[in-house]
Amino acid sequence: MPASSDKLQPKDQQTIELEQKLAVQSIRVFLQSKTSYDVLPVSYRLIVLDTSLLVKKSLNILLQNNVVSAPLWDAQTSKFAGLLTSSDFINVIQYYFHNPDKFELVDKLQLNGLKDIERAIGIQPYDTRSIHPFRPLYEACVKMIESRSRRIPLIDQDEETQREIVVSVLTQYRILKFVALNCKEIRYLKRPLRELDIISTNNIMSCQMSTPVIDVIQLLTLAGGVSSVPIVDEQGKLVNVYEAVDVLGLIKGGIYNDLSLSVGEALMRRSDDFEGVFTCTENDKLSSILDTVRKSRVHRFFVVDSNGFLTGVLTLSDILKYILFAES
């Protein structure tokens, strides 16, 4: 009898793998059959900022409206001019930190001067791609992955004037939530994460509660594309996270006066609507991960072992890449 049971086990594993492969392929077909416009809610609010606006005023607008990014508009050319994100404010902080004598320049900086800041501190600008809202959703996902961005602007064109129209901005989170809400196939994604090769485990940056905020900001700048730094205790156990968007709340009271604060002190100023730290283990399944995305506003999962030690990071970009390109 034991020998017979052993023979059945590989078949069970093969079934799980086959079901996952077919499920991913089905989700991919779903993404190809839908447009970016299909993801948008029936009604929504969109904040678009003119490139002549002062950076400090744009920060206040983002905070007052509880958003972390906004499309930019060049009134002179009547064209979309990029996206304003927390990374732009981090770049300005870096510039001011290394050039304290330029305080007045930073205080009068307009949004159209952010590219000059990038060049001054040696930051490679992001490739901000856009897409027409009626193009396939799959195409929008691929463009996001190729440009290393977590969001993509949807740009239409007025038929009479031929001028561009900013329709909305689509995020990886919104796309994956759309998948989780509409694709029943996710229940077949039962392979453990450790088998999928989608967890980042090498060179995971971290900090502690006592780490100066400016050190964490420098980590966010140097890493490129990283939007958060996990906070661990002396033993390496995960206790919290410092996100790029936390920088916005830190500098709202003045122009970068509190960079000497520790991470722990800075977190005291965090907004009350912080979603929390989401964790998983390498034994969790994508089905449960996407179920969490369906229920909660989550942007990444920190992978921990059974004792709570940080072992890796699983981003929404990692999940999206797997759905787009794996199991083909």
UniProtKB/Swiss-Prot annotation:
* Entry-linked Gene3D superfamilies: CBS-domain
What are the binding positions for AMP in this chain?
Answer: 150, 227-228, 315-318
Binding of ADP 2, residues: 150, 227-228, 315-318
Query: Which keywords label this protein?
Result: ATP-binding, Carbohydrate metabolism, CBS domain, Cytoplasm, Nucleotide-binding, Nucleus, Repeat, Transcription, Transcription regulation
Q: Which GO terms describe its cellular component?
A: cytoplasm; nucleotide-activated protein kinase complex; nucleus
* Annotated ranges, domain CBS: 42-103, 123-186, 199-259, 268-328
Q: Which residues bind ADP 1?
A: 47, 151, 171-174, 297-299
Cellular localization per UniProt: Nucleus; Cytoplasm
Can you name one GO molecular function term for this protein? Answer: ATP binding
Pfam families, per database record:
CBS
Chain sites annotated for binding ATP:
150, 227-228, 300, 313-318
The domain comment in this protein's record states: The 4 CBS domains mediate binding to nucleotides. Of the 4 potential nucleotide-binding sites, 2 are occupied, designated as sites 2 (or A), and 3 (or B) based on the CBS modules that provide the acidic residue for coordination with the 2'- and 3'-hydroxyl groups of the ribose of AMP. Site 3 can bind either AMP, ADP or ATP (AMP, ADP or ATP 2). Site 2 binds specifically ADP (ADP 1) and is likely to be responsible for protection of a conserved threonine in the activation loop of the alpha catalytic subunit through conformational changes induced by binding of ADP.
Tell me the subunit arrangement.
Answer: AMPK is a heterotrimer of an alpha catalytic subunit, a beta and a gamma non-catalytic subunits.
Family stated for the protein in its record: Belongs to the 5'-AMP-activated protein kinase gamma subunit family.
Physiological role = Adenine nucleotides-binding subunit gamma of AMP-activated protein kinase (AMPK), an energy sensor protein kinase that plays a key role in regulating cellular energy metabolism. In response to reduction of intracellular ATP levels, AMPK activates energy-producing pathways and inhibits energy-consuming processes: inhibits protein, carbohydrate and lipid biosynthesis, as well as cell growth and proliferation. AMPK acts via direct phosphorylation of metabolic enzymes, and by longer-term effects via phosphorylation of transcription regulators.
Q: What is this protein called?
A: 5'-AMP-activated protein kinase subunit gamma
Lineage here is: Eukaryota, Fungi, Dikarya, Ascomycota, Saccharomycotina
